[in-house]
Amino acid sequence: MESGDELNQYSAMITDFIHNCREAEKGFISSQEWWILSGFVKVQIFLTSLNDNAELIVASNLFKYHVQNADINEYLLKLNGTLKLKGVCFGIRNKHLILSYIRPVQGLNPEELERIIAKIPVIADEYDD
């Protein structure tokens, strides 16, 4: 199977998943970008455009984080070092505190995709205070 075909296969899998979330507010940006609202958490889903090493990126902006706080940063780094986040990690992107999960698409199946997407709002709810 060609790398481009694999990326299209995973794009179709994600699109099918989003379509099956009938009640959820959602959006289709492109064949490589989607979003879904889970509670108050907007989960963004991306496929990289790298044909040979395509990756799935599932992320959410938690809040604006213009002025960084050393104590918060240290706490988040310590959380990232535990197993409590189940593969999800905190980070900073475009002056926002984010949660993200990155995985190569090789071997991804619909059940795992659903679990990955579901992790972000659960962890966001747990640590939003």
Segments predicted by a language model, with ranges:
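Charge-rich, low-complexity N-terminal segments
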Residues: 1-44, 82-85, 89
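Ordered, soluble secondary-structure elements with a strong preference for glycine-centered loop motifs
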Residues: 4, 8, 66, 107-114
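Hydrophobic residues embedded in beta-strands of well-ordered beta-sheets
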Residues: 34-35, 54-56, 97
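Short beta-strand micro-motifs enriched in acidic
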Residues: 46-50, 91
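Short, surface-exposed beta-strand-loop junctions and turns on beta-sheet-rich folds
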Residues: 51-52, 64, 105-107
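Short, internal acidic amphipathic alpha-helical interface segments
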Residues: 57-96, 102
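Well-ordered alpha/beta subsegment
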Residues: 85-118, 122-129
